[in-house]
Regions:
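Short, contiguous acidic/charged loop-to-helix segments that flank catalytic cores in large enzymes
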Residues: 19-21, 151-155, 175, 180-186, ...
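Short cysteine/histidine-rich metal-coordination sites, predominantly Zn2+-binding motifs
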Residues: 180-183, 204-213, 243-253
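Conserved short loop/turn motifs at secondary-structure junctions
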Residues: 47-51, 79, 180-183
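Iron-sulfur-cluster electron-transfer modules
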Residues: 1-43, 48-55, 59, 64-65, ...
């Protein structure tokens, strides 16, 4: 910009915002510019910038804008790759292709940037949905971005391993149900690796239609079995069957030795924790 000014080269009217380093700019900052009324965003890097990082942010922002029919409105220029004349020309070419943003004059929502970055990002995307009234259909499978879909099959025993390890609350347990909020998932894969039954499958995917959903979905709700004593529903059938298998396997390994036979242990397994104690001393 200084070089362009010294040479008195004409370029489109811009509002320069200086940051300590362009690497500090994320997709949330870029999308917030459109929330504040920008028609487009130009990012000017320097020779010390980590271009891969900012290119990722630019790609996501352009995908988000395109998902809501706003088109690509973010342009990255590397300072090390152009002189003053090139900068002026590239800027002019970019601005020439820009149309006024359809949401530029709409009510601006105040974004709380002290919240976790993912919460801010989801709020910005939901604002785009609300303002454009477009239900996005853009999906990128095997995405480089930290989003994933999770599936749980019938082997799940509701052991809580995945829920306990999920630091973003993408997975939660409600009664005997495991629920999933797609927007909260950061694709870390801990749930998949932690599942002792190998019942969880995680697939990387960026699905903008699910980012505008505020409610989660139930991944699994296994059948519960009733206590043979009091009739209370107390254990999932999958857990009952899995524990029964382990007890039978243990019988073969131990030669049937123990205070209780496998048959007796299997019988006690049919009772809830309250009835089991009294049944064991009969």
């Amino acid at each position: 910009l200084n070089a362009v000014g010294r040479k008195k080269i004409k370029y489109p009217a811009l509002l320069p915002l200086f940051v300590p380093c362009i690497d500090l700019v994320s997709e949330t900052h870029i999308l917030n510019a459109f929330e504040l009324g920008a028609d487009g965003v130009i990012l000017l890097g320097c020779e010390n910038s980590h271009l891969e990082q900012i290119e990722t942010a630019v790609k996501f922002a352009n995908m988000a804008l395109s998902a809501f029919d706003l088109g690509e409105r973010v342009f990255l220029i590397s300072d090390g790759q152009c002189d003053a004349e090139d900068f002026a020309k590239e800027t002019a070419d970019f601005v020439k292709e820009l149309s006024p943003s359809p949401i530029r004059n709409m009510k601006r929502e105040k974004i709380d940037f002290t919240k976790p970055k993912r919460d801010v990002l989801l709020e910005l995307i939901q604002n785009l949905h609300k303002k454009t009234k477009v239900h996005p259909s853009l999906i990128e499978e095997n995405t480089q971005f930290p989003f994933a879909d999770v599936a749980i099959d019938s082997k799940c025993t509701i052991c809580n391993a995945c829920v306990n390890l999920c630091s973003t609350n993408a997975l939660s347990k409600e009664g005997n149900k495991v629920n999933f909020v797609y927007g909260n998932c950061i694709a870390c894969g801990l749930c998949e690796r932690a599942c002792p039954e190998e019942a969880i499958t995680l697939e990387s995917a960026l699905d903008f239609s699910r980012l505008v959903e505020k409610e989660g979905k139930t991944l699994v709700e296994p059948e519960l079995i009733a206590c043979a004593g009091c009739g209370k529903l107390f254990m999932s059938r999958s857990a009952f069957e899995r524990i029964s298998e382990l007890l039978k396997e243990r019988e073969g390994d131990s030669g049937g030795k123990g205070e209780l036979s496998v048959e007796e242990q299997l019988e006690l397994l049919r009772y809830c924790e309250d009835c089991r104690a009294s049944k064991a001393v009969e």
